[in-house]
Every structure is written in structure tokens, then in C-alpha cells.
């Protein structure tokens, strides 16, 4: 949270925490420095004998180094704690290969440091911001680090992102050949109108071409160069520098028109000449975002400044320590507070980084976005440094290993210190690797069981699919059988009706075939013949009746067919007329719609509104003229009534008539004759 603002420089402190890996490395450092730091706090003299704890491989010292004093160990302790708070890789003193930094993935580089995670979110918020609502099209941001090694880690994080980078301190990991355009400068040899200065022209080389009064041909005949100039790059700029370089070069950032500063060094002083030059040249507010680890030694030293206290502590320099008693006491106090508060719970503050970046770029106050950054209040149990458990390292608990760090008891030289630090870090790394290996075994078993369960589930799904497919096939065959049965029943009914009709005809034919035999008497024969003749005549009459009826039906059918043809032709004519009418109606509707659009369109509305306004203006003018006319009439009437002008004119006319002279009542350019 911002606690200190100066003219055009707004400082905001962004709280960060420590990862579990950083906490374990801090506990390893505590195990090495606990005895010496406790002795320095109590004021005990430094021990001379070297008592190595059990577990350290003993060996002859071929290259003896001077023993480190309590003050030196305290400075080393403070420096290493600050390095771990920034990134665990900074604890390593040897050279880091550039190829490794270029190839390291972003996830692995930021996994061990919460500061790097916050920085990654900040630069992503800058890169993927809403450019339409952003006041600046291209953002120029400066990132200030403690050292060159930290700057290498930062550049490895930035590589591959949509930024143009410029390394101001140290050598770049990968030269992307980004060139920052030079700011326009005022040339003293050229006047404002483009003509050369007389003083400078006289002092110029005599071989140079003299000024002819015509403007110089500025046309660039290189097509390739023109095409390059036309390409506008809208990527943002990131400038990488260190605090040391910023202290020694006050014009380091003066020529880049910086919009924002992100400082990894929370002890960066706003009163530095480089920042003062940047403040004086800027015509805008420049926000400075400092990443500060909560409850760290830096937080303890900056607490008075964050709370806007008038008391200012002497801040530490990143390069070398001045042997000052007040500074040394402040270091011990900050480290003691870090030891007391290292196990206190820290709230993870949820910050909207996109909103924070937008607020900073717009020059607004961001205090309401950032949380309050105060030191935690310690209880008496946490402040009690006399307890042995206070100095005991408390590593993150592992499930499959329980390695304890013994406290180093005895003097240390720089070689022994580095060896022991590496030895304990390697032991912790092996424990973590074993924890990972043993922890992945049940995970693999669960993964295998889940795979088998998924395979069984797939088999069940396959069997369900096959069963469902067979069910559909059976249902289809049943439906087909039902349809065939229905069709067969219909055909059977038809055939049964035909059989009944044929049986009836057969019965009639059998009755006709029953003729009388020759043995029958003639009388019987005549009776049978007359009966047969009567029946035949009946059938003939019935056939004739049916034939006449059929003929009538055919004639009626022919008339209906003729009438149907006439109606069909009439229907075709009417339908064609209806189609033409529908087409005409459609055309009329489209034309009507277009006319409505024209009437309701902006052009017609604009002209109508303008005419309405003109009519309203003319009506207002007419009313004003009417009122003015009425006023003048009333005024004339009033004047005539007050001064009796009509009577005076009449008197003058009468006097003139009596005297025999001429009188002109109206004004004229011609002279009056009296």
C-alpha cells in the first residue's frame, strides 16, 4: 500500500510472501547462524574452538581460511536471507549459464519465488490490458533489480513475452535487436523556420554547401527503408537496470520517458538523483511499485517509512556494508524480528493486478486497491528468544522423511560455511526427491486402478450398446411382421369376398344347367321351358335396364367431365390472375416499405426537422415583429395623446392659411416657402 508520495512519483508497496522452498532455505540458514547470531544478540564473545556437529564428514583442511567474526556472519546471514526472499537461485555464488536461463520454462523459474510470480502477473496485466481504454498506446516500464544475476533471472522470465526489452545494466541473455527511438532534441544550428543559424553557419566548414534559401530535399529514395518505417510496432518496452547502476548514473532513465517502475529492491530510495531527474523531466505521475516480502527484514526497516513516520532508518546498501554500529544494530533487530515472525500466519492478499495496472497508468490513487501492509503484532511467547525451541530450525513437515537440522556450534570460515550450506541444502533436496518418489507410488496405484475402472466402464458401455442395438433390430423385425400380418389380413378379406361372389355365380350357373331330361313327359317339358323362358326374359329385361342405367351414368359422367374441364380452365385463369395480383402486391409492399424507410430515414428526418426549426424560427420572428408593431402603435398613440401633435399641426395649418402662407407639415428635402 502506498505510504509515501512525492511530486510526480507515487510509491506503492505490493505485499508478497515466501514459498515453502524459500522457507526451508531460510531454516537452513538459521541452523548455521543460530549460535553466532544468538551470541551477538546476548553479547557473548566468539568461541575459538571449532566443534563440528556429528554427521559432517571430517577431512584435513588443505586451504585454511580466516575465521568469520560474528559481525561478518550477521552480514552474511542478512544478505542470504534477502537473496532467498528474491529467488532461491540467488543463494548460489557460482556462475549461472546463460543457455540454461534462456531455456528454463517460465513455470519452473517462478515456482520457487512468490516475487517472480507476482512480477509475472504484473507484466501479463500490462501486456494483455485493454488497449482501447488505455491512455498510452505503448507502455515503457522499468524493472529495477538488486544485482546483475537477479537481472539475468528476470530477463529469462521476460524472454518470449510480447515485449521489447532493453538491458541497461549488464549483458543481455539474447540480443533481440530492439532499438528505442531517440527522443526529439532541439538543434541549436537550426532556427524554428528551418533555416540555419547565422552563428553556426559562419563557423561551419567552408567546404560544406552554403544555404541557398530552399528547403533541403528530405525525400528518402530507399523503398526498403520506407517500408521499414511504415511498420509500426505497438509492443510495450521493458528496461532492465540495477540499483547500483541507477545510483552511479543519474541519466540512466532520463531518455526513455518511463511510464511505470517496478522495483525488486524495496529499499530503493526515491531521493536518488536518477529518479529526481526522471521526476523533473516528466509531465505526468510515475508510479513506483515496490515488491516487499511481508515480515521480512526489509519490511521491518521500512515500517516507519510505510507508516509515514518522521523517523527514517539508515537503509542498507546492496554492495558492501559500512561498519557502522547503528546500521549493525538495525540489521540485528530486523533479523531478530524475522526470526520471531517466521512462523506467524500470513494472509494471502487477493489483488486485482489488471485493475492495479490500469489505475497506475491512469495516474489515479491505488491505495484502495492494495491491502494495508503492517507488521504483525507478536505475543510474548514469540518474542522469547531464550527458549531453545526458538532457535531450532522448523522445516516443512514431510510424510516419508524426518530429517532434523543440527545447529552449527563453533566458528566458521567462508569455505566451511559454503560447504556446509551446500551439504545441508543437498540433504534437504534429497529428502524432497524421496518424498516425491514415495508420494508418487500411491498416485500411480490410484491412477492404475482408475484406468482399470475406466476400462471396465468402457466394456460395460460397449455391452450396453450392443444390447441396445440388438433390441432395436428385434423391435424392427416385430414392426415389420405386424405390417406384413396387417397386409395379409387385408388381402385375405379381399380374396374371401371374391370367393363368395364366385360361389354365388356358380350357384346360379348350376341352376341354369339343371335342364329336364328326355324321359320327362312333354307337359312337364313345356312347363319347365316356360319357366325357363320367363326367367330368361326376366334376366334380359334386367340386363336392358342396367344397360340403360349405365348409359345414363356414362352420359352424366361425360357432362360432369366437361364441366370439370371448364372449371379447371377457369381455376387456372383465376390462379394466374391471383399470382399476378400477389406479385403486384409484393412489388407495391416493397415500394411502400422503401418509401417508409425514405420517409423515416435520417435524411428526410433531418430535412423535416430543419424545416420545422425554420418554421418555428419564422413564427417566432413573426410574433416578435407583431409585438414590435403593436408596441410602436401604442407608443405613437401615447405620444399623440401626451403632446397633442395632431392639434398643433391643425393650429399651424390654420395660422398659415390665415396669413396666406404655405405650410408643409411633413419633412422634405425641398425648402419650405413661407
Curated annotation (Swiss-Prot):
Superkingdom of origin: Eukaryota
Family to which the UniProt record says this protein belongs: Belongs to the HDA2/3 family. HDA2 subfamily.
Ranges of compositional bias, category Low complexity: 197-211
Keywords: Chromatin regulator, Coiled coil, Nucleus, Repressor, Transcription, Transcription regulation
Gene3D superfamilies: 3.40.50.12360
Other remarks in the entry: Present with 1500 molecules/cell in log phase SD medium.
Biased amino acid composition, Polar residues: 185-196
Gene: HDA2
Coiled coil stretches, renumbered: 468-637
Region annotation Disordered: where it falls in the sequence: 185-211
Protein's job: Required for activity of HDA1 histone deacetylase complex. The HDA1 histone deacetylase complex is responsible for the deacetylation of lysine residues on the N-terminal part of the core histones (H2A, H2B, H3 and H4). Histone deacetylation gives a tag for epigenetic repression and plays an important role in transcriptional regulation, cell cycle progression and developmental events.
GO terms classed as biological process: chromatin organization; negative regulation of transcription by RNA polymerase II; regulation of transcription by RNA polymerase II; regulatory ncRNA-mediated gene silencing
InterPro entries xref list: HDA1_su2/3_sf, Hda2/3
One GO cellular component, as annotated: cytosol
Disulphide connectivity of cysteines: none
The keyword Repressor appears for this protein: yes
Gene Ontology molecular function: chromatin binding; DNA binding
Record-given protein name: HDA1 complex subunit 2
Subcellular location: Nucleus
Keyword Transcription carried by entry: yes
Amino acid at each position: 500500500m502506498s505510504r509515501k508520495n512525492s511530486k510526480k512519483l507515487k510509491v506503492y508497496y505490493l505485499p508478497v510472501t515466501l514459498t515453502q522452498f524459500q522457507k526451508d532455505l531460510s531454516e537452513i540458514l538459521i541452523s548455521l547462524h543460530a549460535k553466532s547470531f544468538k551470541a551477538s544478540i546476548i553479547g557473548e564473545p566468539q568461541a575459538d574452538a571449532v566443534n563440528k556437529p556429528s554427521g559432517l564428514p571430517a577431512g584435513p583442511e588443505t586451504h585454511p581460511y580466516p575465521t568469520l567474526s560474528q559481525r561478518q556472519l550477521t552480514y552474511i546471514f542478512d544478505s542470504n536471507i534477502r537473496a532467498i526472499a528474491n529467488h532461491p537461485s540467488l543463494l548460489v555464488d557460482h556462475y549461472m549459464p546463460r543457455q540454461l536461463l534462456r531455456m528454463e520454462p517460465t513455470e519452473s523459474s517462478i515456482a520457487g519465488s512468490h516475487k517472480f510470480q507476482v512480477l509475472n502477473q504484473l507484466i501479463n496485466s500490462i501486456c494483455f490490458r485493454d488497449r482501447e481504454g488505455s491512455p498510452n498506446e505503448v507502455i515503457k516500464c522499468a524493472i529495477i533489480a538488486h544485482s546483475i544475476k537477479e537481472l539475468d533471472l528476470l530477463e529469462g522470465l521476460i524472454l518470449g513475452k510480447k515485449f521489447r526489452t532493453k538491458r541497461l545494466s549488464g549483458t543481455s541473455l539474447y540480443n533481440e535487436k530492439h532499438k528505442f527511438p531517440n527522443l526529439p532534441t532541439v538543434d541549436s544550428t537550426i532556427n524554428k523556420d528551418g533555416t540555419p543559424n547565422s552563428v553556426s553557419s559562419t563557423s561551419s566548414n567552408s567546404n560544406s554547401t552554403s544555404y541557398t534559401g530552399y528547403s533541403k530535399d528530405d525525400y528518402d529514395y530507399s523503398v526498403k527503408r520506407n517500408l521499414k518505417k511504415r511498420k509500426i510496432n505497438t509492443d510495450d518496452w521493458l528496461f532492465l537496470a540495477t540499483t547500483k547502476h541507477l545510483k552511479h548514473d543519474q541519466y540512466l532513465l532520463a531518455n526513455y520517458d518511463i511510464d511505470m517502475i517496478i522495483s525488486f529492491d524495496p529499499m530503493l530510495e526515491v531521493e536518488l538523483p536518477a529518479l529526481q531527474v526522471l521526476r523533473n523531466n516528466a509531465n505526468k505521475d510515475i508510479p513506483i511499485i515496490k515488491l516487499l516480502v511481508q515480515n521480512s527484514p526489509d519490511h521491518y526497516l521500512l515500517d516507519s517509512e510505510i507508516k509515514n513516520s518522521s523517523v527514517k532508518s539508515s537503509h542498507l546498501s546492496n554492495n558492501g556494508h559500512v561498519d557502522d554500529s547503528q546500521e549493525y544494530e538495525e540489521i540485528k533487530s530486523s533479523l531478530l524480528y524475522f526470526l520471531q515472525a517466521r512462523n506467524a500466519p500470513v494472509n494471502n492478499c487477493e489483488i486485482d493486478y489488471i485493475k492495479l495496472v490500469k489505475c497506475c497508468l491512469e495516474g489515479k490513487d491505488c491505495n484502495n486497491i492494495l491491502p494495508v501492509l503492517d507488521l504483525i503484532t507478536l505475543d510474548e511467547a514469540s518474542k522469547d528468544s531464550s527458549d531453545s525451541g526458538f532457535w531450532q530450525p522448523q522445516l516443512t513437515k514431510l510424510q516419508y522423511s524426518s530429517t532434523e537440522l543440527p545447529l552449527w556450534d563453533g566458528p566458521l570460515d567462508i569455505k566451511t560455511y559454503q560447504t556446509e550450506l551446500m551439504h545441508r541444502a543437498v540433504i534437504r533436496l534429497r529428502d524432497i526427491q524421496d518424498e516425491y518418489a514415495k508420494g508418487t507410488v500411491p498416485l500411480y496405484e490410484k491412477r492404475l486402478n482408475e484406468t482399470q475402472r475406466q476400462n471396465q466402464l468402457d466394456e460395460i458401455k460397449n455391452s450396453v450398446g450392443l444390447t441396445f442395438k440388438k433390441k432395436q433390430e428385434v423391435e424392427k423385425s416385430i414392426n415389420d411382421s405386424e405390417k406384413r400380418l396387417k397386409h395379409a389380413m387385408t388381402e385375405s378379406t379381399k380374396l374371401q369376398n371374391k370367393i363368395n361372389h364366385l360361389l354365388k355365380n356358380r350357384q346360379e350357373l348350376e341352376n341354369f344347367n339343371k335342364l329336364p331330361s328326355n324321359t320327362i313327359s312333354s307337359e312337364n317339358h313345356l312347363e319347365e321351358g316356360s319357366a325357363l323362358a320367363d326367367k330368361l326374359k326376366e334376366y334380359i329385361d334386367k340386363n336392358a335396364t342396367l344397360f340403360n342405367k349405365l348409359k345414363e351414368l356414362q352420359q352424366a359422367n361425360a357432362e360432369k367431365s366437361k364441366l370439370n374441364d371448364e372449371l379447371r380452365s377457369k381455376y387456372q385463369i383465376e390462379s394466374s390472375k391471383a399470382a399476378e395480383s400477389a406479385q403486384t402486391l409484393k412489388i407495391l409492399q416493397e415500394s411502400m416499405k422503401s418509401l417508409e424507410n425514405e420517409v423515416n430515414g435520417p435524411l428526410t428526418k433531418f430535412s423535416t426537422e430543419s424545416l420545422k426549426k425554420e418554421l418555428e424560427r419564422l413564427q417566432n420572428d413573426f410574433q416578435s415583429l407583431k409585438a414590435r408593431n403593436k408596441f410602436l402603435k401604442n407608443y405613437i398613440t401615447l405620444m399623440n395623446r401626451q403632446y397633442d401633435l395632431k392639434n398643433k399641426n391643425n393650429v399651424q395649418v390654420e395660422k398659415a392659411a390665415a396669413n396666406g402662407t404655405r405650410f408643409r407639415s411633413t419633412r422634405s428635402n425641398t425648402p419650405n416657402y413661407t
